Amino acid sequence: MSFKNAISWFEIPATDLSRAQKFYEAIFGITMIPLDTPNLKMRMFPLEDMMTGVGGAVVDSGGFHKPSATDGPLIYLNANPDVQLVLDKVGAAGGKIIVPKTTISPEYGDMAVIIDTEGNRIAFHSVPKG
């Protein structure tokens, strides 16, 4: 078996959903989509096609997920066309850069790591146009 995408959904924990939403909207220039259930409050990242793309959200789960700057998986968010364009907005939006733009290789692009407003360690990745 092979996957088009190894990940189908991700959740970034938030203790202040409004603050987290403003942060991600500011650095990516997007409008997040509210999706609340009885147990979760979510703000989804916009997605063209749920069947072929990777979806995700910032989530207030009432403590089921907890923000962490050191533990757990590291999620890489799409920062195309250039990681630096997103990094340039991180400080003003309330985040902190902990790994600056770093080239992985010419063919695999660049990455960086930040701490978001909720205390999560989040990575960015961009791939050069081929």
Where are these regions (language model features)?
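N-terminal beta-strand motif that seeds the catalytic metal site of vicinal oxygen chelate
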Residues: 1-21, 73-75, 125-130
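Core segments of cupin and vicinal oxygen chelate
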Residues: 2, 11-54
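Vicinal oxygen chelate
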Residues: 7-15, 64-91, 110-115
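Short acidic/glycine-enriched loop/turn segments that link adjacent beta-strands
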Residues: 38-42, 105-110
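Conserved active-site tyrosine of GNAT-family acetyltransferases
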Residues: 20-24, 90, 119
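Active-site beta-strand termini and strand-to-loop segments that position acidic
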Residues: 45-50, 114-117, 127
